[in-house]
């Protein structure tokens, strides 16, 4: 059975912006979802964050098209009141956004959070793994 993964915003941006030296591993993670080797998910709050970050490289129409394509490829796990409260009450995370990523991963029943910021997820209930390590599984 395919792994269920939540792909962190930084990995998606590595792919979309072709950031070296991270692009190739990010591409392999995304291709694993497209090819059915993994079931991929992104957190809904990653979409507006990426829309903002990508503004330096793409105009609004291009950003909408790029992000719409991501939403078609991946499942999208939303943030609701329950996840927000759980994130706000969780003092084990220093970064609130990372905690929300973990809450989305839990809700999605993800096996892994694929991220370059593994150290930010030391207290995560879902194992965090680097893209290069994930593609080596």
Go through each PLM region and give its residues:
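Active-site neighborhoods of divalent-metal-dependent phosphate/nucleic-acid chemistry enzymes
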Residues: 75-118
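Short, flexible helix/strand-to-coil boundary loops that buttress conserved ligand/catalytic motifs
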Residues: 16, 88-91, 125
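Short, well-structured N-terminal submotif of metal-dependent ribonuclease cores
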Residues: 1-41, 55-62, 123, 136-137
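A general alpha-helix detector
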Residues: 11-12, 49-50, 86
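Short, conserved alpha-helical segments within structured domains
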Residues: 42-46, 83
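Short acidic, glycine/proline-enriched helix-loop-strand junctions
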Residues: 63-84, 121-137
């Amino acid at each position: 059975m395919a792994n269920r993964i939540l792909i962190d915003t930084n990995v998606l941006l590595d792919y979309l912006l072709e950031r070296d030296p991270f692009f190739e591993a990010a591409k392999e993670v995304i291709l694993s979802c497209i090819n059915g080797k993994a079931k991929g998910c992104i957190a809904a709050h990653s979409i507006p964050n990426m829309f903002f970050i990508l503004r330096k490289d793409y105009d609004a129409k291009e950003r909408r098209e790029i992000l719409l394509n991501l939403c078609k490829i991946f499942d999208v796990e939303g943030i609701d009141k329950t996840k927000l409260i759980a994130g706000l009450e969780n003092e084990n995370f220093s970064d609130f956004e990372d905690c929300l990523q973990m809450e989305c991963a839990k809700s999605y029943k993800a096996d892994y959070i694929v991220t370059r910021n593994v150290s930010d997820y030391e207290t995560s209930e879902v194992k965090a793994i680097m893209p290069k390590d994930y593609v080596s599984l």
